[in-house]
């Protein structure tokens, strides 16, 4: 077990904002990152960027002071998922996720793989229902539950397996906090500041609404990454959240 970056080497942020990076060019991504302050947000690296640029890109972001949510949504047989989660922990990321639909044995194996990392283990989060999915999409998969009901079923399984929380839509957050308690972390994509384009998300909410709903961490992408002044945009979002708290 070799941690590449300890939390003590990175900036401390109390912001719930996680900026979702979405770049095809590594230099463009780093150019954007160099415009913002790690005290104002964390960063999310997904499948495309990790496939293009690899673990070294994550290390470069960490060296700039950022906590990293490695959003790879592992979904495999238990042993493979466990090894993947342990590899993410070795990389020193702040958060990593798996698909709850992988089942209880897979999620339990992933959680157990993090035990050797102790306090340096990343948060382990499960994905419930992707925010782009509607009831008709679930019906195509043979799921007759609504997105909200199916997400709650998967969230209950996630908590039973001892994970730290779930990725869910902001609309589900109020219910989830009531059912699963304050310590069960809720991570929400589809967050758009007032006036932003909805993009490819179907179930969206503003940062202020998300905070009021009980969201712990909110992923915000293009409204920040495509801003002419991303640092100021982040500061404005954080200021509005502080006023709403």
Curated annotation (Swiss-Prot):
Lyase found in the keyword field: yes
Enzyme Commission designation: 4.1.1.23
Residue positions binding substrate: 22, 44, 71-80, 131, 192, 201, 221-222
Keywords tagged on the record: Decarboxylase, Lyase, Pyrimidine biosynthesis
InterPro entries noted in UniProt: Aldolase_TIM, OMPdecase, OMPdecase_AS, OMPdecase_bac, OMPdeCOase_dom, RibuloseP-bd_barrel
Pathway: Pyrimidine metabolism; UMP biosynthesis via de novo pathway; UMP from orotate: step 2/2
Annotated GO CC locations: cytosol
HAMAP family per record: OMPdecase_type1_B
Family, per entry: Belongs to the OMP decarboxylase family. Type 1 subfamily.
UniProt-recorded name of the protein: Orotidine 5'-phosphate decarboxylase
Organism field: Shigella boydii serotype 18 (strain CDC 3083-94 / BS512)
Organism lineage string: Bacteria, Pseudomonadati, Pseudomonadota, Gammaproteobacteria, Enterobacterales
Gene name per UniProt: pyrF
């Amino acid at each position: 077990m070799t941690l590449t970056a300890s939390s003590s080497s990175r900036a401390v942020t109390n912001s719930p904002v996680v900026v979702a990076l979405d770049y095809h060019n590594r230099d463009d991504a780093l150019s954007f990152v160099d415009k913002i302050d790690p005290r104002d947000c964390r960063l999310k690296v997904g499948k495309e960027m990790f496939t293009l640029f690899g673990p070294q890109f994550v290390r470069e972001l960490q060296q700039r002071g950022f906590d990293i949510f490695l959003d790879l949504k592992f979904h495999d047989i238990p042993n493979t998922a466990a090894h993947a989660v342990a590899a993410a922990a070795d990389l020193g990321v702040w958060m990593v996720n798996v698909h709850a639909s992988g089942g209880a044995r897979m999620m339990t194996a992933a959680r157990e793989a993090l035990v050797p990392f102790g306090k340096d283990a990343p948060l382990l989060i499960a994905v419930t229902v992707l925010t782009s999915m509607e009831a008709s999409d679930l019906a195509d998969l043979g799921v007759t539950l609504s997105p909200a009901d199916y997400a709650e079923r998967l969230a209950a399984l996630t908590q039973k397996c001892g994970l730290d929380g779930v990725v869910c839509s902001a609309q589900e957050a109020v219910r989830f906090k009531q059912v699963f308690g304050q310590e069960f972390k809720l991570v929400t994509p589809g967050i758009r500041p007032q006036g932003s384009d909805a993009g490819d998300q179907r179930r969206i909410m503003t940062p202020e609404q998300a905070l009021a709903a009980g969201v712990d961490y909110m992923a915000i992408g293009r409204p920040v990454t495509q801003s002419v002044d991303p640092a100021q945009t982040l500061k404005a979002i954080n200021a509005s959240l502080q006023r709403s708290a």
